[in-house]
A protein has these predicted regions:
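GH16 jelly-roll
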Residues: 1-172
């Protein structure tokens, strides 16, 4: 559950990875990527993006696996406000068969779970980038030239019957 300011150039995200090694094929499941600001006069964008990347992975025909991508129209789903105003909850369920994304308890995307996500554990990241690699203009003036992201809580659950092909760390 988090909230962040929507100033031009802000980029709050909650996502998972199967590997941090760029030389290893892996899955990146972006639960929420919200892009702040759509111009100085209208800094609040009503939606956010969900993307599933399958880095370096190919289909049986040799083509690269296509990602899943969805723009989540919060207000059209019955949301009471944009992503940046009050706290919202974002969720991800990765099952043996399906991967499901949620916004405030509402299912917003479902796709088949990729093989790597079935075989390797996922770890999650929460970050608040300013600017980003695409060179977005940054304008934090509305917020006193500062910007914050507030994380109220994170909950992680695991199913007991999931068996990974690599060992998980021992519990201490």
């Amino acid at each position: 559950r988090f909230t962040a300011q929507s100033a031009p150039g802000t980029w709050p995200a909650f996502w998972t990875l199967t590997s941090i090694d760029r030389g290893i094929n892996g899955d990146e499941l972006d639960i929420v990527e919200a892009y702040g600001g759509v111009g100085k006069g209208n800094p609040n964008h009503p939606g956010y993006s969900i993307t599933s990347h399958f880095w370096g992975q190919k289909e049986p025909d040799g083509t690269y696996k296509k990602r899943f991508n969805k723009r989540v129209p919060i207000m059209e789903l019955g949301g009471k406000s944009y992503w940046s105003t009050p706290f919202h909850t974002y969720g991800l369920y990765v099952g043996r068969d399906e991967t499901i994304y949620y916004f405030d308890g509402i299912e917003v995307l479902r796709h088949t779970t990729n093989d790597i996500s079935k075989e390797k554990p996922l770890f999650f990241l929460i970050n608040y980038a300013i600017g980003g690699i695409s060179g977005w203009p940054i304008d934090l003036e509305r917020f006193g030239n500062a910007s914050d992201m507030y994380v109220d809580y994170v909950r992680v659950f695991a199913e007991n019957d999931i068996q990974y092909s690599i060992p998980l760390p021992e519990k201490k």
